[in-house]
């Protein structure tokens, strides 16, 4: 079997998504269903097309222009990255501004610290 016949053209891909925090449980379920249950989750804040919110605290008005989001990272070799991205997109979708973004990036190498395995074997 050639590399072109393997998922991700024989390489390793990082699927990184910035999503609403309340959609994390749905995304985790969707990832498990497509065979990519391993993930890293980080709380982040950022700004995109979602409008800023004006609030008051102790009589002072202020603008919140950085919104709380969750970054989900999933490294895959045997599961097609497009399938992972589609699963995240379907699970995180609300149709409103601020649903997030998904990026697919190549991974040059992976090393499993415990075993020393590298490349696809480490994923």
UniProtKB/Swiss-Prot annotation:
GO cellular component: cytosol
Segments traversing the membrane: none
Post-translational modification, as annotated: Uridylylated on Tyr-62.
GO BP, sorted A to Z: regulation of nitrogen utilization
SUPFAM superfamilies: GlnB-like
Keywords of the record: ATP-binding, Cytoplasm, Nucleotide-binding, Phosphoprotein
Molecular function GO terms recorded: ATP binding; enzyme regulator activity
Positions annotated to bind AMP: 98-101
Name of the molecule in the record: Nitrogen regulatory protein GlnK2
Gene expressing this chain: glnK2
